[in-house]
């Protein structure tokens, strides 16, 4: 007889984080996150065709068993609801007949077992009795043998799924109606412009007659007006009694004169063209956006920087959906490299920590591991690092304990792919990405950049092993990290900088910015090397430039870490301010001031392939919070923290940085700082050589 391994249930966290242990729907750990991620990854279309993510999609456990032992002073009636078919067993007396809406547990000590099966969505469970409720005290099994499973621990729930009718699989983002600011009518066409970029369901208003309506969406006027090449499009056919969405083949009865499209689309502009005797009076947008508070704030004496922060925060808000996606038009997928930046920006703005955990779960998927996350070598390493980042900002040990077994299995898989020298080298099937570089960049051999992010992953593994109490792993990964760290300078340092790669044992003459800026950020360059990197790489125009906000995120952070905040502030004004001058209401995937409209909209061989609302474009939100307001945790969950504000050429600035239990508020003028922290531990304000202790809950004025 096999003894089944049981897992402590992980409760759903889809919404604003509330630190309670409450009654909620429950399910197998990570399954709702993986299922949700799969659903979101399949929303992408191109030219009206379905465009799936091109990596393996794992599935939820289709059948699970929940268990709890109770001791009752009196018999108790329990209401039950489940997503799927279910069977109830009390002790070993066999299953209760059918699928009753209520069942009774007799007085005394009893073990309740409830099996739930659902092939379509995770088999979730809801229970409501006087004392017996669905909460973190239940355990769940996937019927795997105990010798092959790990132990999972509970997290707190939150009240989003606090009633039987609030089924987790039915969750959707809230919607609101947005009216266009400009509408042009001409013949059988309508062209509408909204105030800023958004995502949601286009509504056709006042539809009369029969025929076909073609819809072309655009992040720019040129894209929406170019019916042939617009990236997103829809076609709807109206007859006397039915409406057919031709892209999804969804047929609905025709009632009234208004119709909402089936699929959500990104847009700022839209063209509607009617064929036949059908006509459309107007359009509105049923905007779909998460209702989450923007807890971070920033305001200063420079109106351009204020606008940059606001547009960055709005860009991130649009891409903060059921999971963190990289762009609302293209790709609408979860990418680990994009996600880790979104998480960091999120810690300084929305503080939507549930979506971070959900995306981390969804990106990881399940065992056995067969490929890199997103098929990309570097993105696997970013995934490890994102787990530790999350812990540092939130102090959430329980999540680390839940996810650590999958960290172990992923790292074990990857270590089997190291080359004979124990270094990272791309293998067949690996996408060695690094960045979309403006010039040719070798991806062959041992890239110094890849060693840096792998080393950081080993450090994250060691730290997380310590958090879960696995001393053996902590020591093992620390030793591996130290061994690799000692190889960096002898292998890649040319006396002035880290070279790009070593191929067939020979260091290249090429120097790129990537590994050098990561060496600074991760502390792998000593003081002398850091100064050399600053002068010979980061401030050297002969070194290939970085044109994506993705890697500018790290380049500008490295400059800030080296004390170049004024230079970075000027860069933000020029680069992100440049996008604003071009009319951007969200920040783009890439931006080259030399490119002209509409050619600058092209990417990936498509005239409108570039995303104009891309999460990695919002990096000023993170940079401003961490390096100008100057706030960062120095002990997990802001138990301890520091503030090193930098005013630069500003006259004044003020802002709020979220923490797990409150906010840190700072106001800075030329000779005075006001700072107050709530819901966190003791902080240290650092101005030059002066250090001031900041006590929680006390408004302090510091002059300098």
Cite the ranges covered by each PLM segment.
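Bacterial Sec-dependent N-terminal signal peptides
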Residues: 1-23
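Alpha-helical repeat scaffolds
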Residues: 530-538
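Non-catalytic C-terminal accessory modules of carbohydrate-active enzymes
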Residues: 153, 171, 486, 569-704
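Active-site acid/base region of carbohydrate-active enzymes
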Residues: 284-311, 317-318, 323-347, 351-358, ...
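Hydrophobic, well-ordered secondary-structure elements that form the walls
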Residues: 204, 396, 519, 555, ...
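Solenoid-like repeat scaffolds
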Residues: 506-507, 538-546, 574-580
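Extracellular/oxidizing-compartment recognition motifs
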Residues: 23-322, 338, 354-359, 398
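Well-ordered alpha-helical scaffold segments within catalytic/enzyme domains
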Residues: 341-350, 383-399, 453-471, 517-527, ...
């Amino acid at each position: 007889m096999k003894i089944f391994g049981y897992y402590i249930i992980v409760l759903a966290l889809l919404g604003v984080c509330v630190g309670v242990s409450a009654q909620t729907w429950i399910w197998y750990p990570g399954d709702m996150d993986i299922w949700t991620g799969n659903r979101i990854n399949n929303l992408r279309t191109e030219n009206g065709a379905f465009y799936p993510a091109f990596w393996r999609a794992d599935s939820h456990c289709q059948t699970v068993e929940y268990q709890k032992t109770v001791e009752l002073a009196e018999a108790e009636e329990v209401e039950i609801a489940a997503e799927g078919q279910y069977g109830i067993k009390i002790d070993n007396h066999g299953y209760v007949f059918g699928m009753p809406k209520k069942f009774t547990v007799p007085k005394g000590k009893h073990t309740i077992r409830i099996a739930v099966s659902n092939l379509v969505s995770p088999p979730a469970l809801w229970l409501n009795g006087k004392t017996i409720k669905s909460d973190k005290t239940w355990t769940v099994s996937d019927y795997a043998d105990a010798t092959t499973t790990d132990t999972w621990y509970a997290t707190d729930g939150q009240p989003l799924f606090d009633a039987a009718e609030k089924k987790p699989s039915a969750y959707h983002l809230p919607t609101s109606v947005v009216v266009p600011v400009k509408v042009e009518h001409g013949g059988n066409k309508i062209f509408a412009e909204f105030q800023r970029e958004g995502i949601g369901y286009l509504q056709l208003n006042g539809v009369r007659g029969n025929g076909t309506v073609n819809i072309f969406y655009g992040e720019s006027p040129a894209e929406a007006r170019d019916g042939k090449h617009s990236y997103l499009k829809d076609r709807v056919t109206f007859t006397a009694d039915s409406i057919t969405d031709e892209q999804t083949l969804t047929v609905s009865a025709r009632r009234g004169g208004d119709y909402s499209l089936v699929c959500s689309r990104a847009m700022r502009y839209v063209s509607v063209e009617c064929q036949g005797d059908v006509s459309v009076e107007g359009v509105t947008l049923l905007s779909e956006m998460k209702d989450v508070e923007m807890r971070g704030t920033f305001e200063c004496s420079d109106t351009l920087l204020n606008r940059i922060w606001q547009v960055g925060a709005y860009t991130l808000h649009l891409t903060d959906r059921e999971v963190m996606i990289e762009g609302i038009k293209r790709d609408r997928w979860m990418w680990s490299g994009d996600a880790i930046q979104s998480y960091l920006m999120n810690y300084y703005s929305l503080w939507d920590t549930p979506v971070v955990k959900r995306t981390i779960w969804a990106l990881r998927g399940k065992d056995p591991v067969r490929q890199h996350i997103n098929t990309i070598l570097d993105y696997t390493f970013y995934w490890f690092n994102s787990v530790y980042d999350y812990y540092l900002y939130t102090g959430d040990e329980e999540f680390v304990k839940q996810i650590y077994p999958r960290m172990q299995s992923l790292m074990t898989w990857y270590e089997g792919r190291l080359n004979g020298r124990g270094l990272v080298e791309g293998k067949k099937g690996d996408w060695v990405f690094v960045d979309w570089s403006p010039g040719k960049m070798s991806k062959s051999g041992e890239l110094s950049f890849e060693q840096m992010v792998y080393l950081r992953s080993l450090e994250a593994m060691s730290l997380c092993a310590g958090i879960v109490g696995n001393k053996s792993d902590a020591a093992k990964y620390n030793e591996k990290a130290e061994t690799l760290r000692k190889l960096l300078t002898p292998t890649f340092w040319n006396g002035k900088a880290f070279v790009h790669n070593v191929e067939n044992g020979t260091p290249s003459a090429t120097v790129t910015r990537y590994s050098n800026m990561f060496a600074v950020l991760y502390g792998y360059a000593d003081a002398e090397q850091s100064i050399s990197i600053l002068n010979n790489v980061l401030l050297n125009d002969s070194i290939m430039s970085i044109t994506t906000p993705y890697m500018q995120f790290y380049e500008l952070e490295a400059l800030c870490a080296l004390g170049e905040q004024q230079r970075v502030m000027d860069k933000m004004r020029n680069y992100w301010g440049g996008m604003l001058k071009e009319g951007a209401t969200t920040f783009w995937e890439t931006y080259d001031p030399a490119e002209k409209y509409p050619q600058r909209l092209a990417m990936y061989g498509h005239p409108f392939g570039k995303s104009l609302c891309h999460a990695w474009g919002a990096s000023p939100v993170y940079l401003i919070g961490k390096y100008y307001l100057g706030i960062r945790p120095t002990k997990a969950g802001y138990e301890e923290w520091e503030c090193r504000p930098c005013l630069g050429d500003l006259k004044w600035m003020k802002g709020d940085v979220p923490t797990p239990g409150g906010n840190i508020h700072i106001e800075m003028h030329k000779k005075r700082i006001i700072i107050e922290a709530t819901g966190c531990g003791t902080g240290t304000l650092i101005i030059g050589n002066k250090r001031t202790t900041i006590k929680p809950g006390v408004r302090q004025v510091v002059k300098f």
